[in-house]
């Protein structure tokens, strides 16, 4: 699959989707995006900058949601224009899709909305590539139905069907906890869509701080290494220069100062995995 001018897949080095959880300020976006651009360029990693103009599913009604669509898109457009980076952001309703698709390069669907058929159809018919997140409540094999819905909607409009990615972000495990079953990454290959692993939301503790979600950022490298060893097309990681003071999802954000070292390790694992191939494909059921 072609994405933002580069090839992605299990036979290609992993690409990276990264950035702050939410648009906090223009300066933070520009500084973080600039640093990530330098890091990924030095390592040869295809990179898409990510941030959200609105966090519509915060734990509490008093939590910071972002600057809103108009201002948020203006800031993301500036990052794209001045730094020359492709942009990904999430959309939360059908009404937003046209305006957002006119600015960004890749759309993302929130995990909670993966079963909303009309929403998936509308996003699929935007003409943009879409990173479709698997719901925390969904079995990995069920993502085939979600991707099939998106492809059918694209066909209706005569659009390219190979624009969809399947993203794993953990599964609910009791209350206020998520676990990552690494088998999911192999099972989701059955969708025939590139598989992306969200290493930061997978360590989230939903609602774990009462009015906001907690997280175990120290486990991000652990799960990221495991996912890359399984074999994935892309990696999603939220990052922030000061996670302790981030306005959203700080507890599970990678400190920006550690991103390069983490990516260097992941690149080594990725090369080994993809050089040696996938033995599981030779095993009979």
UniProtKB/Swiss-Prot annotation:
Keywords in alphabetical order: Cytoplasm, Lipopolysaccharide biosynthesis, Transferase
UniProt subcellular location: Cytoplasm
The EC number(s) this enzyme carries: 2.5.1.55
Pathway annotation: Carbohydrate biosynthesis; 3-deoxy-D-manno-octulosonate biosynthesis; 3-deoxy-D-manno-octulosonate from D-ribulose 5-phosphate: step 2/3; Bacterial outer membrane biogenesis; lipopolysaccharide biosynthesis
Pfam family for this entry, one: DAHP_synth_1
Entries under InterPro entries matching the protein: Aldolase_TIM, DAHP1/KDSA, KDO8P_synthase
GO biological process: keto-3-deoxy-D-manno-octulosonic acid biosynthetic process
Enzyme class: transferase
GO MF annotations in UniProt: 3-deoxy-8-phosphooctulonate synthase activity
Main localization (coarse): cytoplasm
GO CC terms in record: cytoplasm
Catalyzed reaction equations: D-arabinose 5-phosphate + phosphoenolpyruvate + H2O = 3-deoxy-alpha-D-manno-2-octulosonate-8-phosphate + phosphate
Protein family membership: Belongs to the KdsA family.
Designated name of the protein: 2-dehydro-3-deoxyphosphooctonate aldolase
Gene: kdsA
